[in-house]
Amino acid sequence: MTQTAGPRITGINHFSATVTDLDASVAWYQRLFGLDRVPFDFRHYEREETGYGVVLMDPRLGIAIGLHANTANRGEAFDECRTGLDHISFGVADRDELAAWVARLDELGIQHTGIRDEKEPMAYSTVVFRDPDNIQLEFIAFG
């Protein structure tokens, strides 16, 4: 059975993560990506009474990252074995760009896997690392 495609999507606009220490996470993501903080806080959709978010942006990179604090947060570390998010992957142009990101991660003292090359089911390379709340992040280049 062939599925019909929906309307066109031009890309992912942003992602948002709930974090245990908003200030520490804002500083970490700003250091890594060089993002600017949007100068106001956003109320968390459908949790306005307990949560709010900060948005970090860089139009040059075409990326926006939302970080949310919530008073109902129990302070547990992220675990991809629970229902919800597994990881977030950032595409880069090629393996040389991956090497540049490895150097950046090393400069900031962020532990990572190093570049891992895969051939199946297609040729790609990744670098995997984690944010302060243990959310798995990766850079990926195809080819």
Regions found by a protein language model. Give the residues of each.
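Core segments of cupin and vicinal oxygen chelate
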Residues: T18-A64, A69
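Short catalytic micro-motifs in class I SAM-dependent methyltransferases
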Residues: H14, F33, E138
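A short, acidic/glycine-rich surface segment
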Residues: P39-F42, A72-A77, G114-I115
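N-terminal beta-strand motif that seeds the catalytic metal site of vicinal oxygen chelate
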Residues: M1-V26, E49, L85-F90, G143
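Acetyl-CoA-dependent GNAT
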Residues: H68-R74, F142
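Vicinal oxygen chelate
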Residues: M1-R8, I12-T20, V54-V55, P59, E76-G143, ...
